[in-house]
C-alpha cells in the first residue's frame, strides 16, 4: 500500500484561534462527508483516510489477497484480509460510482465552508468549537470536553451508502461503525 499524505502547518495570530469551549445546551452542526459539495467535481463516497484499510478489507473479495500481496501486512490473520464479496468495478448501490472509486474518494476538506464561517464575525463568535471527526468518528467530540458533559446526537445525517454497504455485508454493529467511520 502506498500512502500519499501531506501536513499543513501555519502560525495564526492568537486572536484568530478558535478555542474549544463546549457548553451545556450547545447545538452540534454536522457536515456530510459524502455526496457532491459545490466545490467538488465528482461524487464523494465519504471514505476518510482512517477508514480506508478497514473499508477495503471489509468489502473487497479475497481474490485481491493473491493478486496484490503487497497491499496488506503479512502478519495480519488471513481471515481479515480482503474478506468481502465485491470487486473494484462492482456498482455501489445508491451512488453513481463503483466500489473502487468509492473507497478511493478523497477525504473531504471543509476548508471552503469553514473559511466563510470564520470570516463572518457574528457566526465565529457563536461557535464554541470545531472538531473534525477523523480519528474517532462520531465519538471524537468527547476528547475535547474539559468538563463532565453528556453529548447527545439525536439527529444524525443519513448513513452514507458506502457505510450502509459495509454495515450490511460485514454485520459490524452500528456502535462500532460510528466509532470507526466519519
Each language-model region and where it sits:
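Helix-biased detector of long, well-ordered alpha-helical tracts
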Residues: 1-182
